[in-house]
Structures are given as structure tokens and as C-alpha cells.
Amino acid sequence: MPERYAALLLVGAGGFVGATARFLVALVLPFIGTGFPFGTLAVNLAGCFLIGFISQLSVSSSLVSPELRLLLATGFCGGFTTFSSYMYEIMSLLRDGEIFYSTLYLLGSIVGGILCLYFGMQLAKLWA
């Protein structure tokens, strides 16, 4: 099997397991009576921890191969939460001394995300 297809299968399998895990966490930790999304917060924080742990092991040891990193960091964490990848990319920019770009990415994603969400909702209202 060509390497690209194997990588695609690893990411897909990890994503399936990650998305399933996210769904299960949402069942166990719903809005615990307060209206606060504890399940989403737990998933986002756990995903940040996992992608940091996996990425560091892949750099500083031979415990995590490139294939295992694809399965766990890109696949599982990507299916579990995209927030972890976002935080890792910001940290990578900061580590590389790219303060301007890390700040632009951080604020641009938050403000841009909120604006895109709003405009998407408004467009959907026109069609509904």
C-alpha cells in the first residue's frame, strides 16, 4: 500500500476513535445543571494535553513513530478536538519567535471564528 494511503487510513482510524470518544464524553459530562459546557471544556483541555504529550515524545524519544503520531495526534486528537491542534500551532509559532504571527493566529481565529459563525447563522436564517 502506498505510504499516502497508509497515512490516510491511520488518520481516519484515529479520527473515528477520537470523535467517538468525544461523543462519549459529551454523554457523561453534559451541561451539569449550570448551562456551562463542561464536556466541551474537558475535551478541549484533554486534547491540548494529549497533543502536547504525543508531539513532545515524537521529538524527544523514539517512543512515538511518525505513524503513531499521525494516528494519535492528527487522527485521534483531530477527531477528539481541533482546539488542541490550534493551541499546538500557536505554541509552535511562539517557540519559533513568531510573536506577531502567533498573536494574529490566536486573535484572528477567535474573532474570525465568531464572525464566521454569526454570518453563517444569518445566512441560514435567510434560507430557513
Curated annotation (Swiss-Prot):
It catalyses: fluoride(in) = fluoride(out). This is Fluoride-specific ion channel FluC. The gene is fluC. The chain crosses the membrane at residues 1-21, 45-65, 70-90, 99-119. Its main location: membrane. InterPro entries: FluC (IPR003691). One of its GO terms (cellular component) is plasma membrane. Signal peptide: none annotated. It is found in: Cell inner membrane. Na(+) is not transported, but it plays an essential structural role and its presence is essential for fluoride channel function. PANTHER family: FLUORIDE EXPORT PROTEIN 1-RELATED. GO terms for biological process: cellular detoxification of fluoride. Keywords: Cell inner membrane, Cell membrane, Ion channel, Ion transport, Membrane, Metal-binding, Sodium, Transmembrane, Transmembrane helix, Transport. It comes from Chlorobium phaeobacteroides (strain BS1). Na(+) binds at G78, T81.
